[in-house]
Every structure is written in structure tokens, then in C-alpha cells.
């Protein structure tokens, strides 16, 4: 899926997160998680409505859990020009197992308790 891009100021540091990540394991069992995206803009960013639709579209996709961070990374790289792109995914598998997966640039995601929290 190609994401819609928006023009912004070059050099803007951006971090997106969504607690609504849901996709199917190869077994058909659901994985739930939180997606964190971090990058420096080269003059473009993702349209947030399109990004939300993309995240929702993953619900119909079967992936190995270990591949989901790369899949999001690849989609963003194919859609907009960015620098320092990093993806972190915190997953909960059926049975309560927790995983943290990362692809691209290493970063520590800001995990907010509410939308008004400032670090």
C-alpha cells in the first residue's frame, strides 16, 4: 500500500505511535501491539488518515511477528523520503507473551500514559 505524503519543513523530527496495531500470525491467531515510528523529514511526512488506514489494513495480513517492523519500514520508505527511519513494535501474542521488535535506526520510543503528557 502506498501512503499519501504531505510536504513539511525539511529536518523536522517526527515520532508517531499507534496502540491499534493488529495483524494475523501465520497460524491465523491475532497479534496486538503498539507501533512506534521515528524519523527526520527530508521535506515529506505521512498523511495521518492514510497512515491510520494502512495500520488498519494490516488486520487482514498474515505475517511472522518478526517481520512486522520491517513491513512497516518498507512501506514508509517506498512512500516518502526520510532520514534515520526507525520502527519499534511492542507485541502481545496470544498466551500473554510480550515481544519488542525493531528495524532501522535505533531509538527509545516515548511511551505516554495520556495524550497530554510531555517528557
Regions found by a protein language model. Name each.
Residues 1-119:
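N-terminal intrinsically disordered, cationic/polar leader segments
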Amino acid at each position: 500500500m502506498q501512503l499519501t505524503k504531505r510536504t513539511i519543513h525539511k529536518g523536522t523530527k517526527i515520532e508517531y505511535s499507534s496502540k491499534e496495531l493488529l495483524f494475523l500470525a501465520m497460524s491465523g491467531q491475532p497479534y496486538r501491539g503498539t507501533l512506534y515510528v521515528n524519523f527526520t523529514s527530508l521535506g515529506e511526512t505521512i498523511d495521518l488518515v492514510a497512515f491510520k488506514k494502512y495500520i488498519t489494513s494490516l488486520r487482514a495480513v498474515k505475517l511472522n511477528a518478526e517481520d512486522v517492523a520491517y513491513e512497516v519500514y518498507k512501506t514508509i520508505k517506498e512512500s516518502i523520503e526520510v532520514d534515520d527511519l526507525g520502527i519499534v513494535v511492542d507485541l502481545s501474542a496470544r498466551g500473554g507473551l510480550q515481544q519488542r521488535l525493531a528495524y532501522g535506526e535505533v531509538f527509545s520510543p516515548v511511551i505516554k500514559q495520556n495524550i497530554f503528557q510531555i517528557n
